[in-house]
Amino acid sequence: MTNANKQEYRQFCEQTPDMPVFLQPWWLDAVYCEDWDALLYKEKDNILAAMPYGRHKKYGFTTILQPKLTPTTGLWIAYPENLKRLNRYALEIKAMEFFAEQIDKIKPAYFQSMLHFSFTSWLGFYWHGYKQTTRYTYRFTHLEDLDYTFSQCSTEVRKCIRKLEKQDFTVRNDLPLKQFYEINTLTYARQGVKCPFSFEDFERIEAAAAARNQSRRYAICDKEGRVHSVTYVICSGDVWHSIFAGSDPELRSSNAATLLLWHILKEASACSCKEYNFNGSVMRSIETFIRHFGAEQTPYMMIEKHYSKLYSFLKRLKH
């Protein structure tokens, strides 16, 4: 692949209005530190599909992995107008087979990608020896009607919100970046694991997103000024994405995270947001918390392929 591919990909994105934010060149520049490339599927010199990717070093091997703080990547297809269903399926298969063959030529030790939930088929990858795991996100798609949204929450969540609204909590958008990050890391520390992304990763992405007015930082504090919970959101047109959320373990019993999420949903609705995507999670405790807000469960696919037996062994050993 060459820099010409990146330039063509940038042009492709400019001509593709429905390109998801996590496949936009500015996002890729931020998460990959500009060290990324793109596979391009063409018919008659026209780009119909693209698949950006970046290389990572892990356990001493070169891999292609899902970038940090990025819920989905994978491919995107610019479907021609008035395409018959059978031709749409055929285009998906041809594009996926092409990308699978190109990745096979690159031959990383391991390949992994999370596809956008709009893709319901992975046959082109399946026929080339790739594996698939179904994951789940939750999405609010009726934010124009907050009464309906509230009615879909569990009884416990509705009671909790009503109770907390009477208490002296304040939502801030100006918490210093370092403090915001450190509150989030407390969630991982409680579980005895390291935060999967560094402050530098977060700082770089926030700088790029804030420059485009596409990020929002929320922190909920009590009357003593203690920060109970934080949530980081990326906004893309009428779709908002939750990127991460964390709470101070010593203050978790306040349930302030519930009130914070409801505040964010109300603000998203006020900004004419049509969809709020929680972007996960398959972790039981997180899934339970999100599910009780009554959002729509939406499956999406993780595609992967192991090329190195030694890498696979080390990966299993580490986990």
Model-derived regions: residue spans:
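Conserved acyl-donor/pantetheine-binding loop and adjacent beta-alpha core of acyl/acetyltransferases
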Residues: K57-G74
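A short, internal acetyl-CoA/4′-phosphopantetheine-binding micro-motif in the GNAT/acyltransferase core
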Residues: T70-L86, L143-E144, A245-S254
